[in-house]
Amino acid sequence: MKSVITTTISAADAAGRFPSSSDLESVQGNIQRAAARLEAAEKLASNHEAVVKEAGDACFAKYSYLKNPGEAGDSQEKVNKCYRDVDHYMRLVNYCLVVGGTGPVDEWGIAGAREVYRTLNLPTSAYVASFAFARDRLCVPRDMSAQAGVEYAGNLDYLINALC
C-alpha cells in the first residue's frame, strides 16, 4: 500500500541509493503529522454513520432529480447503494489517514470508478457533492483539532479531485 514511507523507500531502492536528506525530511514530516491523522481517523470512525448519512442526504438534496424515475436513486434500493458507496469511500479516507498516504483511495477506490459510474448512470458529481459536504461541515475544534482537520480535509480533497 502506498504511503510517504513506502514511496520514499521504493524510489530510493529503484535508484539504487539510500534515502536522501530531503527524502528523510519528507518521512519525518509524515511521522510528525501521524498523531493528527490518527485523531482524525478516530473521530471519523466514531462518527461515520452520521457523517455518511449527512453527506448522502446533502447529495440527494442538491441533486434531487436523482430520485426521479430512471435516475440513479429512483428506488430505495438504489438510494441505499449510493449511501453504501459514500460509506465505502469514507472508510477509504479513514484508511488513508491511518497509513499516511493515498494508497487505499488510489488502489481500492479510484481505479475504474469513473468508468463504472458512467456505465451505471451514476454521476460522479453527486459523490463529489457528498464528500465536499463532509469536508465543509467540519468544525474545528468541535469535531477535532485544527491539525487533524487539515489532515481530514486534505484526504477528502484528494478523493474529490480524483473523482472529478
Curated annotation (Swiss-Prot):
Highest taxon of source: Eukaryota
Protein's cellular compartments: Plastid, Chloroplast thylakoid membrane
Binding locations of (2R,3E)-phycoerythrobilin 1: 82
Binding residues for (2R,3E)-phycoerythrobilin 2: 139
Gene Ontology annotations of biological process type: photosynthesis
One term under GO cellular component: chloroplast thylakoid membrane
Record's comment on post-translational modification: Contains two covalently linked bilin chromophores.
Membrane topology: Peripheral membrane protein
SUPFAM superfamilies associated with the record: Globin-like
Keyword Ribonucleoprotein listed: no
Keyword Transport: yes
Keyword entries, A-Z: Antenna complex, Bile pigment, Chloroplast, Chromophore, Electron transport, Membrane, Photosynthesis, Phycobilisome, Plastid, Thylakoid, Transport
Subunit details: Heterodimer of an alpha and a beta chain.
Free-text function comment from the UniProt entry: Light-harvesting photosynthetic bile pigment-protein from the phycobiliprotein complex.
Family membership noted in the UniProt record: Belongs to the phycobiliprotein family.
Record's protein name: R-phycoerythrin alpha chain
Protein species of origin: Pyropia haitanensis
